[in-house]
Amino acid sequence: MAKAVTVKIKLVSTADTGYFYVTKKNSRTQTEKLSFKKYDPVARKHVEFKEAKIK
């Protein structure tokens, strides 16, 4: 059986609120860590979210 190309990752808020998004990424084409500006409802503003592993 082949190894899965897409991997589930967690985008964690840099505002230290504990809020996170779960998304998928293609590990072959996107080798660098993802970083997005998304809405954090706990902080009630747009902040940067950085990639972390799902445990």
UniProtKB/Swiss-Prot annotation:
Keywords: Ribonucleoprotein, Ribosomal protein
Swiss-Prot/TrEMBL GO biological process terms: translation
Database matches in InterPro entries: Ribosomal_bL33, Ribosomal_bL33_CS, Ribosomal_bL33_sf, Ribosomal_zn-bd
Organism: Methylobacterium nodulans (strain LMG 21967 / CNCM I-2342 / ORS 2060)
PANTHER family on file: 54S RIBOSOMAL PROTEIN L39, MITOCHONDRIAL, LARGE RIBOSOMAL SUBUNIT PROTEIN BL33M
Protein name according to UniProt: Large ribosomal subunit protein bL33
PROSITE patterns (alphabetical): RIBOSOMAL_L33
Disulfide bonds: none
